[in-house]
């Protein structure tokens, strides 16, 4: 069985497209195919918004790796290899941002699973130049194209979606970039969590902060707390920072692969835990979050999360804390609480 994802396998079949090129890899890349690519190219750089993948790929000196919500560095790339992301809006964002950086004349290769909507590249790329499908395998497609027009200048501020929420009399302005969970809307799970939260004090972590809804609400309702917000996704971090700024709130926003970069003395860990990874469901991060939570809480520390009721989280929480209470429940979501 190949160590590569299906999109990487179809790219591997077409290595001639990359020979002698300066390649910039971006999008939903999840494996070490860029290392093999580097053996055939003049240079390979990887831009990722996924902090977990960045921590993995940055250890390899044969390629240059960047993490962020936009590529700040100058690039000499003449070919963009785009792994099609799960959200169409994120694909549009990546094309606009990266082609503005690479300019007219650059080539593009797009790979992705057919179920991810990769076919959308045919219409999406029309503004830049021609693109055509050249291979199909493993339920994936391989497209090649060329940017023949000078792309518009990119301004990240143009890509934020803005919306307002009002919970318990707290009015908040939310800023959300493409690629963020529940982009541009207030999800019902987070709403139930905010309606249920008790008064908070001390150092509080919003784990998996997304667009910053939960963290901003906690800071506005409990102005004395020391707020920290983390996420694996760079678009989420940029969105949370923008949400805090839009509401005149303060908090430390940082990247963390589960607990890789967090403190270990929180009074509260509050979360709407992520359980989707790409197009698939992945419970590992949430199970680690819950199972290891006591190690990152102070002696009086408490964990409060919202989760889909069908997820088997209570036994994990019970095993970690020796207690687990349900604070609130609807037919779809449950609020779980545990304390040390």
Curated annotation (Swiss-Prot):
E.C. numbers: 2.1.1.172
Reaction(s) the record says it catalyses: guanosine(1207) in 16S rRNA + S-adenosyl-L-methionine = N(2)-methylguanosine(1207) in 16S rRNA + S-adenosyl-L-homocysteine + H(+)
Keywords: Cytoplasm, Methyltransferase, rRNA processing, S-adenosyl-L-methionine, Transferase
Disulfide bonds: none
Major subcellular location class: cytoplasm
Methyltransferase recorded as keyword: yes
Recorded GO MF terms: 16S rRNA (guanine(1207)-N(2))-methyltransferase activity; nucleic acid binding
Membrane-spanning ranges: none
GO terms for cellular component: cytoplasm
UniProt keyword Nucleotide-binding present: no
The protein's assembly and partners: Monomer.
Family matches, as NCBIfam families: PRK09489.1
Function field: Specifically methylates the guanine in position 1207 of 16S rRNA in the 30S particle.
Family the entry assigns: Belongs to the methyltransferase superfamily. RsmC family.
Entries under PANTHER family matching the protein: RIBOSOMAL RNA SMALL SUBUNIT METHYLTRANSFERASE C
The protein's name: Ribosomal RNA small subunit methyltransferase C
Organism: Vibrio vulnificus (strain CMCP6)
Gene (name only): rsmC
């Amino acid at each position: 069985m190949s160590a590569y994802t299906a999109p990487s396998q179809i790219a591997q079949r077409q290595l001639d497209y990359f020979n002698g090129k300066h390649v910039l890899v971006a999008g939903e890349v999840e494996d070490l195919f860029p290392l093999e690519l580097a053996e055939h190219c003049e240079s390979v750089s990887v831009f990722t918004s996924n902090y977990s993948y960045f921590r993995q790929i940055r250890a390899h000196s044969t390629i240059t790796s960047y993490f962020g919500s936009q590529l700040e560095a100058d690039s000499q790339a003449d070919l963009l290899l785009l792994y099609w992301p799960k959200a169409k809006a994120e694909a549009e964002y990546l094309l606009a941002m990266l082609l503005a950086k690479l300019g007219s004349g650059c080539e593009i290769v797009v790979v992705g699973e057919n179920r991810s909507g990769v076919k959308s590249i045919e219409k999406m790329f029309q503004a830049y130049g021609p693109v055509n499908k050249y291979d199909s395998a493993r339920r994936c497609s391989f497209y090649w194209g060329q940017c023949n027009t000078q792309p518009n200048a990119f301004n990240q501020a143009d890509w934020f979606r803005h919306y307002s929420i009002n919970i318990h009399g707290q009015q908040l302005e939310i800023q959300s970039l493409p690629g963020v969970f529940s982009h541009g809307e207030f999800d019902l799970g987070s709403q139930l969590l905010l309606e249920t939260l008790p008064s908070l004090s001390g150092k509080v972590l919003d784990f998996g902060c997304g667009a910053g809804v939960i963290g901003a609400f906690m800071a506005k309702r409990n102005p004395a707390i020391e707020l920290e917000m983390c996420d694996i996704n760079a678009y989420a971090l940029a969105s949370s920072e923008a949400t805090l700024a839009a509401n005149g709130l303060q908090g430390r926003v940082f990247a963390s692969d589960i607990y890789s970069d967090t403190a270990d003395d929180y009074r509260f860990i509050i979360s709407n835990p992520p359980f989707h990874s790409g197009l698939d469901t992945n419970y590992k991060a949430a199970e680690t979050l819950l199972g290891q939570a006591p190690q990152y809480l102070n002696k009086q520390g408490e964990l409060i999360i919202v989760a889909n009721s069908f997820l088997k989280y209570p036994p994990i929480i019970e095993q970690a804390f020796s207690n687990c209470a349900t604070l609130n429940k609807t037919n779809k979501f449950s609020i779980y609480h545990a304390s040390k």
